[in-house]
């Protein structure tokens, strides 16, 4: 790859971390065959993480020239990736979609072409796409300025500043956790608690009028300002441009920001004229404004071509100034002309050197925040070096203000002295006003924002980072405050964490995670294409007291809540939690040497505190649901996120898998129930439109595929019911003497699942769904047979479905009745036992059942009643031996689970360094050396372990047809989950050669696993 020096490129521009967890970055190695790479954090074995091998995304010109990149930035939705090279060529890649080949329904995701990003935008016809994993990308837009670098290039075409626009969507952001001291300290294990809340904000800044569409703006060195925007439908981008000024020669430093009154503000430095100018740009969105209104009523509305009014840009200059001199005597600073963007400044220590040699370092605009009264900040940074060679940075903060349009400022001063003010209706003009300044030692390299622009990040040349609170303008990650507990918790720094130390930091590209809990970086002179990742390190509150541990758990819960509200991948947060658990364990081992059981209990309580506070932080109450709210639970993202967190943290316990097993079971009950109801609705809609006599072969194929897609999940659900009955049966046998039984009430999964409200509701809902499906399919079979329309696809699929149901040793309707009896009994018993208990006790009981798998004394008594009732029912209604010896090992849950034999529990290595040989990923539900259970479809699939544990796909790689793969004894192409290590086929294994656009229930999980984390496509 050819590389050229680009002074305008800042290291932070060359790497971007998406909310979906994918890190895109310019290749840090010179003369590489790649210019853009992609990686992500992935779970290796349940207790350790690693950054995946970097995946190549080659962004090339038509002549295959691989130019040096100057910009890499994900959009707010984290689906669109903006790329620019040093010649000013601009590209947009779309992640998570596969290009369908023209004239067919075959996806390029299934092909075996190279890793280069495909160029959908080059096609003459409008392309069609399908959803797929986020590590597959298609190029959907190119703005080529300099096609052949061998020819004379346009010197002013390079992009010097870029920004994505916000989206037209209501934003929910959690308020800082606030400390509440309890009046009666004996009422809780902790003498204090934290309360949580949220703010809901209307769309702010400048946005595309259509809420599902995106736009971005770019400024080139020649002053050309461009808006790239999507149309009213489809994903393709268009552009419109305007020149900021005719006076611009060459812009070398600039920034773009947004106000809450729909202004785009641009501040730019022209290195020839030495002017710092600020401009206001407004967007006339044309026909898209009316289209946005119409689409709220009719999502498919298309504006007639004759009404297409193209969006355009309007520019107004706000101010023009010159920067401070490069040579500055200390005494001169007081007398500076304010037009030179300086302010009076006395040395803080009174020992200011006699002179400073400085230069303009950067211009950064911090957009207005979500609050209505939030305003935009313009930061002008200078680097100075005194006579001793010591470097410092001074950041001047300016804001936009409205002033009366007077003839001269002298008249304004005269009016103030005479107590005369301008009329209320007098015209006003915008101006740039100095607010304050911040002086820091060291050289600031770049400035960005974090956590919805609430914090400003200052990146220094030596690799360290300062975090500045946007409101107070105070440094928050190097605070001397040691008060515990903190009055408020708004970041991980409030509970003692800080940025990790990084070696060889002078040539870094670095990105901070969207959660502000870890950093990814690479050395431009290190010779490796791999990134390194480090989570934040604990610097304060290093003790092991309950007060310190609880405050830390609140910090983690608050960050997890932010990830939930903003739909941000929290894998690095989970890795940080695991790192803190390891630190705590090592500290306890040094302190408590003679009581290892106490160490285990403290860590267990710490994990329980993190999970329960995470529930509280998003106001998710396990005891607040009933039969009428199950439909909402099926599509409840917070529940999915909380169970996913519990699943991973539960796997750290090497002696007890109950916590992770319960989370895994409920996640699967959720997806299985959804799949059954989705498919049932599809079948019912289809048969309600036609009489059986009108049924066609195509109808039979479509319906047959729909039924076949359910077979694995129905089998899983039935076998889960069998396992629950097996546990209840064993508990009944071992009730008198548990010494010979590995299973006890303490380690049972069946009892917490039945006794807890949410899992029990899911169980009952799933059983009811299977019952309804069974009845509809029986009637459909009868009607089609009588009409002589029972074609082969329906015949075979119905036969397969009924065979699975009929081979069960359990009569589902009887077990459903038993669950209903249990529900009534538990509700009655709890109402009696909870009488007189403190407020919130019911929630604590539910959290113990679901999050810890533990039974309180009252629940244990109710559990024993259920065991006795079950023993009576089972002996009366079924053949016990058939149930007892029925094989359900493939579920991999409970005291005899297979994966427990390979689990090592907590590992001291939480994140493997890039330089260290990393272990291969151990897939969840591995069935044999060459087979795994598809976690989504619950079917056995052939796998190549090298494919799962090795490299992954960036574009035009993904899956083959499952049927063809089996027939030819090939390995079907796969995807894996970055968090729970699940494996699944990318494409549905269609049995009857149905079109791929059939719309099965699995399409809801095309990008995300059942645990809520992202899939990644694996290379063939």
Curated annotation (Swiss-Prot):
<dbReference type="InterPro" id="IPR048338">
    <property type="entry name" value="Mediator_Med16"/>
</dbReference>
<keyword id="KW-0010">Activator</keyword>
<keyword id="KW-0539">Nucleus</keyword>
<comment type="function">
    <text>Component of the Mediator complex, a coactivator involved in the regulated transcription of nearly all RNA polymerase II-dependent genes. Mediator functions as a bridge to convey information from gene-specific regulatory proteins to the basal RNA polymerase II transcription machinery. Mediator is recruited to promoters by direct interactions with regulatory proteins and serves as a scaffold for the assembly of a functional preinitiation complex with RNA polymerase II and the general transcription factors.</text>
</comment>
<dbReference type="Pfam" id="PF11635">
    <property type="entry name" value="Med16_N"/>
</dbReference>
<dbReference type="InterPro" id="IPR021665">
    <property type="entry name" value="Mediator_Med16_N"/>
</dbReference>
<dbReference type="GO" id="GO:0016592">
    <property type="term" value="C:mediator complex"/>
</dbReference>
<comment type="subunit">
    <text>Component of the Mediator complex.</text>
</comment>
<comment type="similarity">
    <text>Belongs to the Mediator complex subunit 16 family.</text>
</comment>
<keyword id="KW-0805">Transcription regulation</keyword>
<dbReference type="InterPro" id="IPR048339">
    <property type="entry name" value="Mediator_Med16_C"/>
</dbReference>
<dbReference type="Pfam" id="PF20719">
    <property type="entry name" value="Med16_C"/>
</dbReference>
<dbReference type="GO" id="GO:0045893">
    <property type="term" value="P:positive regulation of DNA-templated transcription"/>
</dbReference>
<keyword id="KW-0804">Transcription</keyword>
<protein>
    <recommendedName>
        <fullName>Mediator of RNA polymerase II transcription subunit 16</fullName>
    </recommendedName>
</protein>
């Amino acid at each position: 790859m050819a590389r050229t020096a680009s002074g305008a490129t800042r290291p932070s521009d060359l790497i971007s971390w998406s909310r979906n967890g994918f890190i895109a970055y310019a290749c840090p190695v010179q003369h590489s065959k790649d210019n853009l790479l992609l990686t992500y954090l992935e779970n290796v074995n349940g207790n350790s993480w690693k950054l995946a091998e970097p995946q190549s995304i080659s962004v090339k010109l038509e002549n295959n020239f691989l130019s040096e990149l100057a910009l890499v930035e994900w959009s707010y939705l984290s689906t669109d990736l903006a790329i620019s090279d040093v010649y000013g060529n601009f590209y947009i890649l779309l992640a998570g979609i596969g290009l369908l080949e023209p004239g067919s329904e075959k996806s390029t995701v299934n092909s075996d072409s190279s890793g280069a990003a495909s160029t959908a935008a080059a096609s003459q016809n409008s392309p069609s796409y399908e959803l797929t994993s986020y590590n597959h990308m298609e190029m959907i837009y190119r703005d080529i300025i300099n096609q052949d670098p061998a020819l004379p290039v346009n010197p002013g075409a390079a992009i010097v500043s870029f920004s994505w626009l916000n989206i037209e969507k209501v934003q929910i952001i959690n308020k800082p956790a606030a400390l509440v001291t309890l009046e009666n300290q004996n009422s809780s294990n902790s003498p204090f608690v934290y309360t949580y809340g949220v703010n809901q904000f209307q769309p702010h800044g400048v946005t595309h009028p259509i809420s599902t569409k995106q736009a971005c703006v770019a400024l080139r060195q020649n002053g050309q300002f461009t808006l790239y925007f999507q149309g009213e439908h489809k994903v393709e981008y268009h552009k419109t441009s305007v020149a900021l000024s005719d006076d611009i020669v060459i812009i070398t430093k600039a920034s773009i920001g947004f106000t809450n009154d729909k202004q785009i503000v641009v501040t730019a430095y022209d290195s020839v004229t030495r002017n710092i100018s600020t401009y206001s740009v407004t967007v006339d969105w044309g026909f898209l404004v009316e289209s946005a209104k119409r689409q709220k009523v009719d999502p498919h509305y298309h504006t007639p071509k004759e009404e297409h009014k193209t969006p355009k840009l309007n520019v107004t200059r706000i101010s023009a100034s010159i920067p401070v001199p490069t040579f500055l005597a200390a005494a001169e600073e007081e007398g500076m002309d304010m037009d030179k963007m300086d302010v009076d400044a006395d040395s803080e220590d009174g020992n200011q050197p006699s002179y400073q040699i400085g230069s303009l370092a950067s211009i950064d605009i911090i957009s207005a925040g979500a609050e209505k009264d939030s305003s935009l900040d313009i930061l002008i940074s200078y680097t100075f070096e005194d006579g001793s060679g010591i470097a410092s940075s001074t950041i001047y903060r300016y804001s936009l203000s409205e002033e009366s349009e007077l003839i001269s400022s002298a008249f304004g001063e005269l009016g103030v002295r005479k107590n005369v003010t301008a009329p209320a209706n007098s015209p006003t003009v915008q101006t740039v006003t100095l607010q304050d300044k911040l002086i820091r030692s060291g050289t600031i390299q770049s400035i960005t924002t974090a956590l919805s622009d609430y914090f400003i990040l200052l990146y220094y040349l030596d690799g360290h980072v300062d975090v500045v609170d946007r409101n107070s303008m105070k440094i928050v990650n190097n605070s001397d405050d040691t008060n515990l507990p903190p009055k408020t918790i708004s970041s991980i720094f409030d509970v003692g964490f800080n940025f990790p130390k990084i070696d060889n930091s002078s040539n870094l590209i670095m990105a901070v995670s969207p959660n502000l809990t870890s950093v990814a970086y690479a050395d431009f002179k290190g010779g490796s294409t791999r990134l390194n990742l480090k989570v934040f390190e604990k610097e304060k509150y290093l003790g092991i007291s309950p007060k310190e541990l609880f405050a830390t758990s609140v910090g983690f819960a608050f960050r997890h809540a932010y990830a939930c509200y903003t739909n941000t991948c929290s894998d690095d947060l989970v890795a940080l939690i695991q790192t803190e658990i390891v630190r705590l364990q090592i500290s306890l081992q040094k302190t408590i040497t003679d009581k290892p059981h106490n160490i285990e209990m403290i860590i267990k309580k710490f994990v329980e505190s993190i999970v329960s506070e995470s529930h509280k932080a998003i106001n998710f109450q396990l005891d607040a649901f009933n039969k009428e709210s199950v439909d909402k639970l099926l599509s409840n993202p917070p529940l999915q996120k909380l169970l996913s967190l519990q699943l991973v943290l539960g796997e750290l316990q090497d002696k007890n898998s109950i916590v992770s097993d319960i989370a895994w079971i409920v996640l699967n009950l959720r997806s299985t129930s959804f799949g059954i109801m989705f498919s049932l609705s599809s079948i019912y809609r289809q048969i309600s439109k036609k009489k059986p006599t009108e049924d066609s072969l195509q109808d039979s194929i479509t319906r047959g595929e729909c039924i076949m897609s359910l077979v694995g999940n129905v089998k899983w659900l039935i076998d889960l019911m069998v396992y629950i009955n097996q546990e209840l049966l064993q508990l009944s046998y071992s009730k008198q003497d548990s010494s010979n039984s590995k299973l006890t009430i303490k380690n049972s999964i069946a009892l917490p699942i039945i006794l807890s409200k949410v899992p029990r509701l899911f169980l009952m809902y799933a059983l009811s769904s299977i019952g309804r499906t069974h009845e509809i399919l029986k009637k459909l079979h009868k009607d089609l047979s009588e009409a002589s329309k029972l074609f082969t696809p329906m015949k075979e699929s119905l036969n397969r479905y009924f065979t699975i149901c009929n081979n069960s040793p359990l009569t589902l309707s009887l077990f459903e009745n038993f669950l209903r009896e249990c529900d009534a009994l538990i509700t009655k018993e709890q109402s009696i036992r909870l009488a007189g208990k403190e407020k919130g006790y019911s929630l604590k009981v539910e959290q113990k059942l679901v999050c810890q798998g533990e039974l309180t004394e009252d629940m244990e008594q109710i559990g024993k009643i259920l065991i006795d009732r079950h023993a009576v029912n089972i002996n009366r209604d079924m053949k016990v031996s058939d149930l007892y010896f029925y094989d359900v090992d493939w579920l991999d849950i409970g005291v005899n689970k297979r994966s427990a034999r390979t689990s090592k529990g907590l590992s001291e290595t939480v994140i493997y360094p890039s330089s260290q040989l990393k272990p291969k990923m151990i897939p969840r539900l591995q069935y044999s050396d060459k087979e795994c259970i598809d976690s989504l479809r619950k079917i056995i699939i052939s796998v190549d372990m090298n494919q799962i544990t090795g490299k992954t796909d960036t574009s035009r790689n993904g899956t083959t047809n499952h049927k063809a793969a089996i027939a030819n004894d090939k390995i079907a192409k796969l995807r894996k989950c970055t968090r729970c290590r699940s494996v699944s086929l990318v494409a549905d294994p269609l049995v009857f050669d149905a079109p791929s656009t059939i719309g099965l229930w699995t399409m809801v999980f095309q990008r995300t696993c059942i645990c809520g984390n992202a899939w990644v496509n694996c290379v063939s």
